Amino acid sequence: MLSINQLMKYLRNHHQISVKSNQAQSLRNIGYYHGYKGYRFIRTPNQRIPFSSLDEVIALNKFDMQLKTLIYPKVMFIENALKSYVIEAVLQDSKSENLDVVFNKSITAYQSYAPGSQQYHKQYAKRMTLKGKINNALLRDYSNQKQTVNHFFDTDRPIPIWAVFESLTLGEFGTFFACANANVKLKTSSILHLPSNLDSDGKITEYMIYAVKDLRNAVAHNNTIFDTRFQTSTINKRLISLLET
């Protein structure tokens, strides 16, 4: 493990990057291993940025941090709002906040396919996987003494759907919505005032969730975002069409 002074020397001699003698703390702040090494390329390691000075690395770090500061409250608002809209739609459809009732009445997208068909099996398996992920998320939060979960488990009461949502990641929430029936999807679309000609099946909300998921996670975990390296999937074309209208 190299000391900070050795790292500064390494940057000068190995990477030909100018480092001022008074920049030791700046290098500590951004970090050599997760800072400099993360900022030295665009999206993939083979697209290197030809830095010539540590000042340039520091400037890029500052820009990336300012982007996250700007975006963080907006993606958190979007996540919270979408969960609120879906809870409203689920409660209206299932007439219950009990998770088991919600699952039996509203998380039934698989029923729109012919029993025994390939899509039926695929969607049913997805639904069962979701249930396992929900149980794991609740167990994790219960073990971590999260009060919204412990309050119900410790009093042996059914956990309501709104408390479940507080334990789900955005990706798990996306799967929950994808497994919901058409009534839930169309009600959510109506709450969002989405145009029916572009969202006749109510699936655009699902595309919204997955579109913002990677950005939200990257910002929340303080990962690099300036080059969108966090993106793991493409944006659905229907969502793009909606944004362009």
List PLM regions with ranges.
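Acidic/aromatic/glycine-rich contiguous surface patches that form carbohydrate-binding/processing clefts
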Residues: 222
